[in-house]
Structure formats: structure tokens, C-alpha cells
Amino acid sequence: MSMQSKSAAGRLAGKVAVITGGATGIGRATALAFAREGAKVSIFDIQIEEGFETVDLIRKAGGEAEFFQADLTKADEIDRAFDGSIAAFGPYNVLFNHAGTIIVKPLHETTEEDYDWLMDVNVKSAFLVCRRAVREMSENGGGSIVITSSIAAELGYALESVYCMSKGAVLQLARTISTEYRDAGIRCNAVCPGFVETAHGLKEIAELDAAGQEWEVSGMAATQGRICYPEEVAAAVVFLASDEASFVNGNATYVDNGWYAKG
């Protein structure tokens, strides 16, 4: 059965979705899930080959998708990507702001250049993307925004000081959008994963283990039980983006198998 026929009455049928950082990992899994549920999907990412691969996967399954290469730390490139998406699919009413990265390094060894780069990719990009999105969603009847934060927004982790800062910042961005734009019909929530089986997540675990921590086996068992799969995060994002979550606003959704609750 094609993706189109399966998703004729899908949970996101009739919606137009933009995903930043949608070329790989959680972003790719969510792009595929959005399309499977009936959304038209625009992917914004700096990774060109991987972005087109994701679009190809969606189209081969019968969905509709476009890729727009963009450095999401630059407002002019973001604007070009949004303009291209609107030209292709019309006004969007779902945004999954997922683009991000990580640095694993002791605070005393973290350079100003490290700080600027990580905050630009994780925080400035979210500010620029959401600034454009709330304006257009307000003009077009509202929509749903989901921002990828992390349990690192709430819990402090050694060797990830700037990463934790950045994820706390975007969690607060989600919360403030939810209050400021609620009456414009915009919902905004954050998804907060633990460790996820992506290139990003596995690199993080390897770097932490190399620094003397024990996340790969014992640490994982003690905190979240096992590693999370990107499709499990995507399922949470689909719910938050859908009309099923019509009264869910300003929420931090932990996809961590109880890690944050356990503390």
C-alpha cells in the first residue's frame, strides 16, 4: 500500500510541515513519520546529500516532500528555505525545530569559539526559525511548533555544560512561545529525549565513555534502561504536532523511559 493511500485519513492529513535538521537521525525519522501520517514535508538542513536521500525515501513511499539546503544560523538562508517551502506546498502549519549539535568537553577546556558555535547552531537557529514561523502562523490561523530540547535542559551533566545551557534555552523558548502566541492559535511544545540511537547520540556516548564515564552499558541500564530509537521520539513529535494534542501547550515531553522522573 502506498504512503498516500495509507495516510489519506492520517493524523496529519492536510497539514504542511517544516522540519529543521530533518536530513538524518531523529529529524529523518520524524520526516518519514509526518509523511506517513499525511503531511507534506519540507526539510531544511545543511547536509545536502542526506537531505535529498530523506526526500527520496518519502517520495518512494508515496509521500510528498522537498529539501531546501540552508545554514540555519543565517536569517537570509532560513528565509529562502521558508519561501521555497511556501512556493512548493503553500502555508505551513507544523514546525519541528530539530536542528542541533553537541560538544563533549570539560568546561575549563571549552573555548569561546566552541561556545559561539554551539549556541549558534542550537539556540540562534531556533530563535531565527521560530521568529519567522510565529509571524506567518499567526497570519494563517495558527499551527503547532515542536522544539527538540533534551533531558539535559533539566539535569546537569558533566562535560556538557554548554550543551545543557543551550537545551535549557530552547526549552524556555518553547514555553514562552506557548504563552505569547496561544491566542493566535499557535501551540508550542518541547520534546526532551535521553540518549537516542543516532550518529549524534552514539558519538556522544563514545566521547563520554572515552572521558572515563560508563554510559554505553552500565550507565544506560541505570538511567533509561536501554537506548531510545529515533522512531520512538518521532512518535511523540507526531502526537504533539497533531490535532490530538489540541490542548497540549507549553509542555516538555520526556522521551527517556523514566530517566528524568527517576532523577
What is each model feature region?
Residues 130, 166, 174:
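Active-site helix of classical SDR
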